[in-house]
Amino acid sequence: MYAEERAYGSFDDVMEVYQQIVTESIQLKRLHFGSGCLIEFLGDSGTCETFCGGWISMICWTSDTNSMGSLTVDIGIDDGKYKTYNARGFLLCSKSITSISQNTEGRDRILTVSQENNKLQITFVTLTKVFKEHDIRNLGDPKCIEKFEKECRALDRKKHDDEHRKRSGKQKEKRKVEDTDKKKDDDRRKQEERKRNDEDKQPDKKEESDELPKEKRQKYHDMKRNLEEQSHEDGITLTSTTLVNGAVEGALPPCISIDNHEDQQHDELDKRAYAQGTNREGLSNEDNYGNFRLNKSLEQLRAKLVASSGDIVERSLLKLKECLDNVKDNLIKNECADVTGPSKCLSKTKHIEPKKQIVFSDCVRPVPVCEIKPFIDVRLFETARSPRRLRQRTRTIVGSTDGAIEQQRVISGQNRGRARGRGRGRAPRRRNSNINNSRTQTTIVIDDSSEAENFENEGSFNEDLLATTILETL
């Protein structure tokens, strides 16, 4: 490196005329000085000049992105002379010093301005790269200077071209990267579109597979119908088994009520049958044949159960009729005994009419009549107010399954004439016996409701008879 140009300036009595900030990056300043001195060197020779007065103008530009900038210093003299120094490059600024350095291939420049205490100092240096010794020797020759300047220009152009190539290369690389990114994006979009198209086509395939041929659809329809019939049979057998379980010997026939609960059961069975039919579509022929045999055996078993349940119900009804006949005979015998005896105290019964039907279903527990526990209320002996003869009537009503079997027997005093024909000596004894019989009264209630049977009998004979009849009915 070789210092080709040097310039040093010193100015006194410096005054700032104005300062203008055009933008944040451009500033303008104007100064006046009273006296000054400027020394310049070019190669090995130099000159010195003094000034009595003049002005100095400074223009500074700074970049917004980095520390690059430019600085221009113009010096005007009253005699009509002027000097200019400029440089562009890295800019350094402080409160009193502003410096800029320019770096180019073959030539570097440094320009510094310092202002302090009404004094201004300017320094300007140009550095040049020299490759041969004769260039150094002949540096003061104007021809050599022109040659040197040409070389510097060529170097500057070369540098500019290199920078342009680098920039273009970087741009090409960026374009390649962008192109690859675009290709990747296009590939992704195509793949997504293919997936969407495949997903849109899948439901169509499913619908095609769901559509069965006519033969398969007919088989499926027949299978579904058989399963529905089977489900209805299952519902019938369930009700029959409840009847068999609820039947008790000596009980009245149950009264079945078809309610919403059974309808719900049939709906559930239909749903299960439909689900079984849909699940059986994929079974093989062997499985279908095995299921057919199993269903056939189940149907036979259900038929047997229905027949056996009917037999059991008939047997229970026959036993119930026999028990009712026995009760009827016993009541007739008791009435005959009361009529032939000396006392005319008659028994009196009320007919019990069933107000509520007993419902046998899955949700309601069957409660036959025989399960209603009777209880005997034996009241204290009460004295009768009048010794008159008690006239009583007996009315028995017996209900069966086919209808209410009613039997009414009215026993009146048939032996009144015979009683009148007897001697009068026995009349007091009979009166006493009637009084004693009226005093001993027992009330037997056979139901937990308000309906009751009041039996008024004589002595211990009628009480034992009633107890035996109650046990037989139970």
Swiss-Prot record:
Residues 156-219, 412-441 are annotated as: Disordered. The keyword Calcium does not apply. Residues 417-432 have a biased composition (Basic residues). This is Protein U79/U80. May be involved in DNA replication. Belongs to the herpesviridae U79/UL112 family. One of its GO terms (cellular component) is host cell nucleus. Pfam families: U79_P34. Keywords: Host nucleus. It comes from the Viruses. Residues 156-165, 175-219 have a biased composition (Basic and acidic residues). It is found in: Host nucleus. The keyword Membrane does not apply. InterPro entries: U79_P34.
